Amino acid sequence: MKIYDCIIFNGENSILEIRLNELNESVDHFVIIEFGETFTGIKKKQKINKELLKKFDDKIRYYFIDTNISEIDPWKREGFQRNQIMKGIEDADHNDIIMISDVDEIPNLKDLNLSNIGNKVYAFSLFHSMNK
């Protein structure tokens, strides 16, 4: 069983560094997708700190995708971008664990027993409500 940690990267280098260091012992592959435009279609330059990736080079699967999809609405564009994660998990087996989250949503895998998770799909959503 392998664990894939998959994210869409949008320039959060300091948070990415924390994530990579925190999950390094538990994760087999880090799949990082970066686009040449934002979810809203604004063109942007590559922002990843390649020096940061060197320490984790044997685990990193980094893809910079510079394609013009600005003709579609932001929700479809975000969906298209998230679907590009498939590039980094093509060799995944049915027993592998694939985590997809935002860069700043860092799971604590050290306390979990993932060996008995089985063939199930788990979805976790975190919502913070501000009660007055």
Language model features: what each stretch is:
Residues 30, 62-64, 121-123:
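Conserved beta-strand scaffold positions in the cores of enzyme catalytic domains, especially
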Residues 27, 57, 95, 118-119:
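Short, well-ordered alpha-helix to beta-strand connector turns
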Residues 2-4, 24-38, 57-61:
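Short loop->beta transition adjacent to catalytic acidic/histidine clusters or analogous donor-positioning motifs
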Residues 15-20, 41-44, 107-115:
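A short acidic (Asp/Glu
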Residues 1-25:
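N-proximal low-complexity "stem/linker" segments adjacent to membrane-targeting elements
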Residues 35-100, 109-111:
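Active-site-proximal specificity loops/subdomain of glycosyltransferases
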Residues 75, 105-132:
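Conserved catalytic core of nucleotide-sugar-dependent glycosyltransferases
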Residues 5-11, 33-34, 100-103, 124-126:
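Short His-Asn-centered micro-motif
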